[in-house]
Structure formats: structure tokens, C-alpha cells
Amino acid sequence: MSASNSEGYDWNPIFDAYERETGLVPLSRPGHGYYNDHSPREMLEKGLGICRQVNRLNPDITEIAPEIEGYVHKATGKSPHGLCVETMYYLAMGATQMSYSIIASAYEPMQWYADNYFKALQKWHGFAKEYAEYNWGSTPGGLDPYLSPNLPFSNFTERDGDLGWAYTESGNYAYPLAALGVPLAPDAKRPSAIMLDAPAVRRMNDGELIALSISNGIILDGPAWNVLNERGLSNYVHGTGGPAGKARYFVTDEGGRVAVVSYNADITGTERLQLLRAMDWASGYTLPAIIERMAQAALVPRVNKDGSLRSVAIMNCTISEQESYTIRLRTGRSGAPRLTWKHNGHKDIALKAERDGDDWIVTTPSLEGWNFAWIAVE
């Protein structure tokens, strides 16, 4: 998320001007690069960037159609299947519709675009429409890789370079962790917890950091913790116990939770689950969904305004079929949930959940490599 800050915190001043002059509520078309799927995990970066942009929009802007890039619009570029999976991931991350830049240069015959991109999109259209309609009014839930709204106005030093004001250099840890099933919701209005790295902490004042720790669970990596120590802010927390693993745990006098972990994604399956347990502890055990067994997948729970779980999307981030996913669900409802597995081109499957305390454990069917499916929660 080392995205440019040169345009400010958000685009709302421009949208406000449009609305004043026209009397019409604007539409949003956020972008974030990702021109081909030769390195498909790069769509995670764009999806997380879209989520942040969507969450910063004025609430009356409800038509949000990210641009899916196809530049240079040749047969050697983005794959038809990749285009469809990308569509679903961006819908999961907060888009309400989609726009495509896939013909613009028209290097290929029109029949090629029809037989490839448009034929594939047609096969996924009903699936995408059902997902968007079912999840209307809900938002992605999980952890917020935090970027301060005051970041563009920070005091910059020579260490930041001439363009320090334009780039955050923060949050790059999020992309590899997203592929390990860490549920991320950048700029969520009610995140389960806040994630910080050293660049983010350096650009925040003491008051903002203390206020965050009072109202949210905080997750830090080692370098971020060191910056807090340098500023004397670690004096506001006290060591405590927590789940097994390498994480360190602290609490504030107000009862806030702080977990110090490693953001290194080059870890074992056991370490992945220990990391999620530590993050869940920091959240006060409020993560909406957790993949319990090892999987390299993006997990996107959607939550309603009352905090109840609306759906859980899964995107397989490998080229191998995943035999199944075992997922812990926190539905926010009393009674057993009704769960339905939805997978494009397949019949819906009713899933059986088993109670584990206040949580529910469900195991899904298989999912092909680089594919997308979701669970409707009722």
C-alpha cells in the first residue's frame, strides 16, 4: 500500500464539487493498476487498494465501478479466466459493479475479444450479479492495514527523500499476508483490529496512536514496536499472556490489546495459524472468519451494519486445487446458521456447520486453482 498520497486523503472534494454543480450523486471508478495477470497475486494489491478507496468515499456514493485493466489489449495480455476471477475479487472488496478496459487499443480482431473475453464474462455474469445483489449493504470485515488520514501532512525528514510526501512506504506487508487467509479490510469503519508497521507509526503523532490503542486492538511488527519504544509510547502498555507462538502480548490500562508479531509471510503452516491466533487475540476474538487448516487463499468475510456475518468469499491463490477449506465462522447470530456454498458452473451445496463454543466450523468442497467461490450465510 505504498500508494501515492499526492492526490490527498480521498477524492471527496472533487465528488462534492460535481454534486453541487449538477445536483446528481457522482459515480466512482477507482483504479489501481494491474494490467495483466502474468503475476496473478498482484490483483490482491489492486483489490486492497480498491477497498481503501471505497471505504473513503462519501456514503451517498453507491455506484462504484472499478476499472479492470486489459492494457495492452492483446491476446498475450490478461487471460479470460483471470478477468472473471478479478471481477469477483473486486466485488468482494467493495465494488458494486465493474467497468472494463479490454478493447481500447483494438489490436486483435473484434471476433477474438468476443470469443475470449466476452464469452468468459457472459459465463460468469449471473454468478457475479447474484454475489453483488446478495451482499448489497454489507462491507468487507477484518483487519485494517492502517494508513493515517493525516499522513500527507506529516513532518518529513531527509530520510524520506524528495518525494516522501507522495508515497506512504507503508502497508506492503498486507499483500503476502492476504494470500495466507488473513482477512483484510483497509479503512473499514469498524475493523476487528488495526495493523501498523514502522512507516505508519513514524507518520502518526502520539495522540493519534494512543487514541487508536484505546478504541481498537493493535497489531504491530517488530520494527513498529521499536519505533514506539524510541518515542516512549511502550510505557503505556503492560505485558500479558496470549496464544502460543512467537507473538508478544500487551494490554493498556483501558483494556486495549496489543500484539507484536512478524509480518513475514515465509512461514510454516503451524506458524500461519499461530499468527492468525495472535491477530484474533488482539481483535478480542472478533475476526469474522478464519481459515483453520493450511491454505493459500484470500478470505473476504462481508459483514452487515449490525456486525452479523453476511457471506465469506474465498479466492484460491495457487495453481493447485484445494481439496477443502475448514473455516471458523462468527455469525453474530443466535442459532445454527444456514450456509450455502456457491461456485460458478456448479450447483449450490448446503454446508453443515459444527458448533465450537460461540463459533461455527464448516468445511467446504474443493476449489480449483485460481478460482473463486463463496458461502452465503443466513
What feature does the model see in each segment?
Residues 1-214, 222-270, 361:
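Glycan-processing catalytic domains of CAZymes
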Residues 131-151, 285-320:
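Surface beta-strand/loop "capping" patches
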Residues 211, 247-252, 299-303, 349-355:
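Short, exposed beta-strand/loop patches in secreted or surface proteins that constitute
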Residues 217, 356-378:
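C-terminal beta-strand-rich structural cap/linker in extracellular carbohydrate-active enzymes
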Residues 259-290:
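Catalytic cores of secreted or luminal carbohydrate-active enzymes
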Residues 259-261, 310-314, 358-365:
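Generic recognition of long tandem-repeat/solenoid scaffolds
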Residues 317-335:
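Surface-exposed beta-strand/loop patches in extracellular or lumenal glycoproteins
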Residues 339-360:
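Solvent-exposed beta-strand/loop surfaces of large extracellular or lumenal domains
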